[in-house]
Amino acid sequence: NIILAAVKAEGTTVIRNAAKEPEIVDLQNFLVRMGAKVQGAGESTVVVEGVKQLYGVEYDPLKDRIEAGTFLIAAATCGGEIETKGVFSENIAALLHKLRENGCKIHTKNDKIILWSDGRLKSVDLVRLCN
């Protein structure tokens, strides 16, 4: 939200300890296509130079990686095969690693992920790390 406000604010806004999620990078890409001056999305510092006007563009935003992960986990748990499109494997690499540890077979190519599971998952250790 700060990036969105800063785009139309006068002067330069520096955001420190910024979120680094892929969606933030995608937001920067979208805003830049509209004429905004945003640098550093995906890094800890984002610099936004306010502009007077933004322009309409056509843009295909990132697909929801949380939603894709939910469907992958459901298929892993219930057994069967699922294919997701529009989510890049590097954006959910930790989840895919754990699903493989669970015993799922996973194939990735570009923005396509195919998961197969017999529904008999192995237990794995999960640890949440904070940045």
Residue spans for each PLM region:
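Short, structured segments at the rim of ligand-binding sites
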Residues: 1-131
